[in-house]
UniProtKB/Swiss-Prot annotation:
Belongs to the RNA polymerase beta' chain family. DNA-dependent RNA polymerase catalyzes the transcription of DNA into RNA using the four ribonucleoside triphosphates as substrates. Zn(2+) 1 binds at C60, C62, C75, C78. Zn(2+) 2 binds at C821, C896, C903, C906. Its EC number is 2.7.7.6. HAMAP family: RNApol_bact_RpoC. The keyword Transcription applies. It comes from Lactobacillus delbrueckii subsp. bulgaricus (strain ATCC 11842 / DSM 20081 / BCRC 10696 / JCM 1002 / NBRC 13953 / NCIMB 11778 / NCTC 12712 / WDCM 00102 / Lb 14). Mg(2+) binds at D449, D451, D453. This is DNA-directed RNA polymerase subunit beta'. It holds the Pfam family RNA_pol_Rpb1_5.
Length: 1221
């Protein structure tokens, strides 16, 4: 076998007939497969052992030679080589065709490659290939032209007239002869000369032809190889035939297709030997052509060949295509051994880095390790014995299993794997039962719940894999989400509830006002029943000397509750005492108001600030903030411990609290009946006005909807004001543990208006709430919206998944390749603000974790706040914003100069670790996942603006994100200015239903016509710049790039993506959108090739374009000129330099056809192409800089160094010598 890790690149090309013969181990002459009686392969058939190798390991067909010792011998009786049966997966055969046939990929593709080379239309080609017309190959001295088509009648006529003075043929043979005649160099030179004069369609076709001819010339492929003289037969184990019970056979479709080819080929040979009439031979040749077409790509031309049940047969092309094809099914996603799957269950007693594995599952997964250990300990005498012990599940294997799984992490994965946190490593702990056990805080990252979800478990085997799992993938390290750098392990449900209850305060509880010297004294008092968790007490600050209490408070007494005292025991000793849930208290000592002044009575203090404590129990959001703050200060290890302690505390507190809910806890609303009666009165009034013709039907509908919406809001308002610290439902909602005000309104108030399946609202509201119960009609109306919700979610999941797939595909080769690309460019970061939506993203958010590109000075004083080339952290970013700086020059991915990746300085901080990104980080994949993963949270809606702005629809949510990344023409497109200047006048032309906006530029004046109903976004006298909107709507990036530059377009796409996500409450970091936007603008379109050998109109990589130009400039020639070219992500993924990656994405046959003609070379720089060939990916620890590290050798002591022992021995030897003398 080839060692994949050794080779650098992979090339594809056309196979010549001789190449196909050289691959082959023999010719397949008969259509037979297996003898149905003996079940042995037939001689010369499709499964022949002489050609493809033995079916049994090291045994020839007749049984004369059996065993490894005969390896390599060819049996003299049956002619089969003695070797492993595995060769049947790699040895190929061939079929010698009696007549040449064309390869359907090159004849049928768009554009037809054969047609371009010969300059013949695909329609004419088809007539020739399928024997409907003759084509003139050599006109001789007749009046005919080369490549002229003749019908049967015309051919006879010309033959009668000219005899043998011309040559015309039909079928693939004619095409082969014509292709042999093509002189590539001559054609290319002629076409280049023609291009100077051609225009329009002819020019486009000429460029296409030139492109193909050039490809043939440069790749060394010969055009006539597009016509096949021999057909390769793929190895039999890739098209197996198996016997089913009942004696029938199941076979791969390919065998049927090969049988048709062989049958027709043999028949044609026979007819040729018999010198049959030309017509019969032609008919057979056509049938052979069709058989080979069906084998290569069934259904591409004409009706597909069908098998039993009218099912089209799967041809070789279908074996590669689509989700079930070779690329996606077997090369990019393989099934692996040492894995299992089971239902998951919660296990609150686990540590954050642990998971529970059921004993029988662990035993099966770690079986080889247990066997080895049993033998090593002498419990089993040999491996066979050990295996028997495991199968019997003897008692002495469990201790060994416990020992074996120590220090061996396992990976847990939950489908759908939306981002990298969907696969994490845990240390296994053996548990009873059959379910995998998961830590409750890991659920958020997996989006897992315990209603029947299943997860898969995998065992890393090699030492390297174990080390990587432990150091890079352990769940305890994954505290921040790569999407935006905020903690992903926020506590939820019971944990939140418990800690909220724990930190509540009540005036007048038992033991109020007691003062304790130490926290331990308070605990004793609690255990004795003297105080409660909610009691307000005093504690001496001196008992916690490591904490920062602020100036002068080190020996004071502070007022807190016993619950908060307990809660603070979770924090590190030197962290502030958190007494109120504010950002200030997280970052600095507790406020002065909580300390007793000298001589002040504690009861007076409680009267003064008691209500402040009562009003501020710790809610869910604040618990998340504490995690962030602890992470910033103490990093992973300590945060992980804090999370486990927080979990333990939450669960135990919610148990002690005894919070339950019942019907009685749902409060009564006082004003609902009156509000509903008033609303009904108003609705009657509206209906009356409609009947009298004072309102249109639409106005009536809108008014009724408004009346009921206001009514529901009023009821909701009353419920929102109901805040009772004793009411369990209220506590759940306010703590953030479960439920929101809307759920509460539906329980206690009214459900309000329901949506119809089309998204309109029913005019009849649901007045009942769930406590009262719904009427039949109300229930029926509610079902529409509920079902729509379900279907929308299902559709959105599919849409979002496909978007993620395209994003990953386009960005997968973006890796951090170097430390600094040395660019002096960057972008100007300022707050992103939208006219309608307000602030989208603040300047602070855009600065954190980025490098500065210029020195930043205070706008007032001029002093330096931050110098150039500094990584801005939270403090620095806040300092810059506080100084009133409006825009900052930062290093950006958009302006990075690294080819095939990004440098560390342009990327900045890795959000998942809050440290500077490391070389080898696969930032492209992370970016794609970060954009795709929240896709399901975006809406699918297209909003109808109801007749404003030319009644266009403004696309939002997921469709808008797709529109941006695919660079499609947006819905509701805005007209933009092409010049810098002033708006001269805005005129309405009622007759033609248009408005005209005149923009006066410095050089010329432009007039733009806009729809009559559109509201201009500018006014007369406004100063505007290129690319500014003249009417509201979305700008088409393809237009924007023409009138402005690449960077402006990139910044526009970035701002729009941010708008789509942040308005839906998803905080996405800029850098992820930047990575993808950069991928869309990696290409340029050549306008004028200058003196380079590039074709006009060619689309190529910017880096390649610069290299070609550099060579020409050095030699003193005229360089080529090009313009920036924007590609949607699907197009960009197909245009990648790697044909393997493109072929495995979409349009497999087209990509491979093109790549083989061009003799493309895949440099294997991305991740997908390396996964496909089974090479370690060039990211992370697979980067050359890590792979090429040589382990340090043991230090050898030079000869001149002696130890004392050596010297003593030497002296001894010398003494002996002298004695012997």
């Amino acid at each position: 076998m080839i060692d994949v890790n050794k080779f650098e690149s992979m090339q594809i090309g056309l196979a010549s007939p001789n190449k196909i013969r050289s691959w082959s181990y023999g010719e397949v002459k008969k259509p037979e497969t297996i003898n149905y009686r003996t079940l042995k392969p037939e001689k010369d058939g499709l499964f022949d052992e002489r050609i493809f190798g033995p079916t049994k390991d090291y045994a020839c067909a007749c049984g004369k030679y059996k065993g490894v010792r005969y390896k390599g011998i060819v049996c003299d009786r049956c002619g089969v080589e003695v070797t492993t049966s595995h060769v049947r997966r790699e040895r190929m055969g061939h079929i010698e065709l009696a007549a040449p046939v064309t390869h359907i990929w090159y004849f049928k593709g768009i554009p037809s490659r054969m047609g371009l080379v010969l300059d013949v239309s695909p329609k004419q080609l088809e007539e020739v290939i399928y024997f409907a017309a003759y084509i003139v190959i050599d006109p001789g001295d007749t009046g005919l032209e080369a490549k002229q088509l003749l019908t049967e009648a015309e051919y006879r006529e010309e033959k009668a007239k000219y005899g043998n003075r011309f040559v015309a043929k039909m079928g693939a043979e004619a095409i082969r002869d014509l292709l042999k005649q093509v002189d590539l160099d001559k054609e290319v030179t002629a076409l280049k000369a023609e291009l100077q004069t051609l225009k329009g369609q002819k020019r486009t076709r000429a460029i296409r032809r030139l492109d193909i001819l050039d490809a043939f010339r440069n790749s060394g492929n010969k055009p006539e190889w597009m016509v096949m003289e021999t057909v390769p037969v793929i190895p039999p184990d890739l098209r197996p035939m198996v016997q089913l019970e009942g004696g029938r056979f199941a076979t791969s479709d390919l065998n049927d297709l090969y049988r048709r080819v062989i049958n027709r080929n043999n028949r044609l040979k026979k007819l040729l030997d018999m010198h049959a009439p030309g017509l019969i031979v032609q008919n057979e040749e056509r049938m052979l052509q069709e058989a080979v077409d069906a084998l290569i790509d069934n259904g591409r031309r004409g009706r597909p060949v069908v098998g039993p049940g009218n099912r089209p047969l799967k041809s070789i092309s279908h074996m590669l295509k689509g989700k079930q094809g070779r690329f996606r099914q077997n090369l990019l996603g393989k099934r692996v051994d040492y894995s299992g799957r089971s239902v998951i269950d919660v296990s609150p007693e686990l540590k954050f880095y642990q998971c529970g594995v059921p004993r029988p599952m662990a035993l099966e997964l770690f079986r080889p390790f247990v066997m080895r250990e049993l033998v090593r300990r002498g419990i089993a005498s040999n491996i066979k014995n050990a295996k028997r012990k495991i199968d019997r599940e003897d008692d002495d294997i469990w201790d060994v299993l416990e020992y074996v799984i120590k220090e061996r992490p396992v990976l847990l994965n939950r489908a759908p794997t939306l981002h990298r946190l969907s696969i994490q490593a845990f240390e296994p702990v053996l548990v009873p039962g059959k379910a995998l056990r998961l830590h409750p805080l890991a659920c958020e990252a997996y989006n897992a719940d315990f209603d029947g979800d299943q997860m898969a478990i995998h065992v890393p085997l090699s030492d390297e894999a174990v080390a990587e799992s432990r150091l890079l993938m352990l769940a305890a390290h994954h505290i921040l989400t790569p999407k935006d750098g905020t903690p992903i392990v926020t506590p939820s449900q019971d944990i939140v509830l418990g800690n909220y209850w724990l930190t509540q305060a009540e005036i007048g509880r038992e033991g109020e006002g007691m003062i304790f010297a130490t926290p331990e004294e308070a605990t004793i008092a609690y255990n004795n029943g003297d105080i409660h968790y909610h009691t307000i007490i005093g504690v001496s600050a001196a008992s916690m000397p490591k904490k920062d209490w602020g100036a002068g408070h080190e020996d004071s007494v502070f007022v807190t509750t016993y619950g908060r005292l307990v809660f603070n025991s979770l924090f590190p000793d030197d962290y502030f005492y958190i007494n109120e849930p504010t950002q200030d208290n997280l970052k600095q000592p507790m406020a002065d108001k909580y300390f007793l002044e000298d001589g002040q009575d504690i009861q007076d203090k409680i009267a003064e600030i008691g209500q402040d404590l009562v009003a501020t129990p710790f809610k869910k959001g604040f618990l998340g903030d504490t995690i962030s703050e602890i992470y910033k200060r103490y990093r992973v290890q300590r945060t992980s411990e804090y999370l486990d302690d927080l979990k333990e505390m939450g669960y135990s507190a919610s148990t002690i609290s005894g919070l339950t809910i019942g019907m009685a806890d749902i409060p009564e609303t006082k004003t609902k009946d009156a509000l509903v009666a008033e609303a009904r009165k108003q609705v009657k009034q509206v209906s009356k006005m409609f009947r009298r013709g004072k309102l249109s039907d639409k106005e009536r509908h809108d008014n009724i909807i408004k009346i009921w919406t206001d009514c529901k809001d009023a009821v909701q308002q009353e419920i929102a004001e109901f805040k009772d610290q004793k009411n369990p439902i209220s506590v759940m909602q306010q703590s953030g543990a479960r439920g929101n005000i809307s759920n509460f309104t539906q329980l206690a108030g009214m459900r309000g208006l329901m949506a119809t399946p089309s998204g309109e609202l029913f005019e009849i509201p649901v007045i009942s709430n769930f406590k009262e119960g719904l009427t039949v009609l109300e229930l029926f109306m509610s079902t529409h919206g509920a079902r729509k919700g379900m279907t929308d979610t299902a559709l959105k999941t599919a849409q979002s998944g496909y978007l993620t797939r395209r994003l990953v595909d386009v960005a997968q080769d973006v890796i951090i390749r170097e430390d600094d690309c040395g660019t002096d460019r960057g972008i100007t970061a300022k707050a992103i603000v939208d006219k309608d939506a307000g602030l989208i993203e603040s300047l602070y958010d855009r600065l954190v974790g980025r490098f500065t590109n210029r020195t930043i000075r205070d706008p007032q004083t001029g002093e330096v706040i931050c110098s150039k080339g500094v990584l801005m952290d939270e403090q620095m970013a806040q300092k810059i914003v506080d100084a009133g700086v409006q825009e900052v020059q930062i290093r950006s991915i958009l302006t990075c100069n690294t080819s095939h990746g990004i440098c560390r300085k342009c990327y900045g901080r890795n959000l998942a670790t809050a440290e500077e990104v490391e070389i080898g980080e696969a930032v492209g994949t992370v970016a794609a996942q970060s954009i795709g993963e929240p896709g399901t949270q975006l809406t699918l809606r297209t909003f109808h603006t109801g007749g404003v702005a030319g009644a266009e629809d403004i696309t939002q949510g997921l469709p808008r994100v797709q529109e941006l990344f695919e660079a499609r023409n947006p819905k509701g497109r805005a007209v933009i200015s092409e010049v810098d200047g002033v708006v001269d006048k805005i005129e309405s032309n009622a007759a033609e239903h248009l408005q005209e906006i005149t923009v006066k530029g410095k050089i010329d004046t432009r007039v733009y016509t806009i729809p009559y109903t559109a509201k201009p976004a500018v006014q007369e006298g406004d100063e505007i710049h290129r690319g500014d909107k003249l009417i509201p709507g979305s700008i088409d990036p393809k237009e924007l790039i023409k009138v402005t530059d690449t960077l402006t377009t990139e910044e526009y796409i970035l701002a729009e993506v941010q708008k789509s996500y942040r308005t839906q409450g998803v905080d996405l970091a800029d850098k992820h959108a930047e990575v993808l936007t950069r991928q869309m603008l990696q290409k340029v379109r050549v306008l004028d090739p200058g003196e380079t050998d590039i074709l006009p109109g060619e689309v190529m990589d910017i880096a390649e374009f610069r290299d070609r130009n550099r060579d020409v400039i050095i030699s003193g020639g005229i360089p080529a000129t090009a313009q920036a070219y924007i590609l949607g992500i699907t197009k960009a993924a197909l245009e990648t330099n790697s044909f393997l990656s493109a072929a495995s994405f979409q349009e497999t046959t087209r990509v491979l056809t093109d790549a083989s003609i061009r003799g493309k070379n895949d440099p294997l720089l991305g991740l997908k192409e390396n996964v496909i060939i089974g090479k370690i990916i060039p990211a992370g620890t697979g980067m050359p800089i890590y792979r090429d590290q040589v382990p340090k050798a043991d230090v050898q002591q030079p000869d001149s160094v002696y130890s004392i022992a050596d010297l003593e021995k030497k002296m001894e030897d010398e003494n002996k010598e002298t004695e012997s003398k």
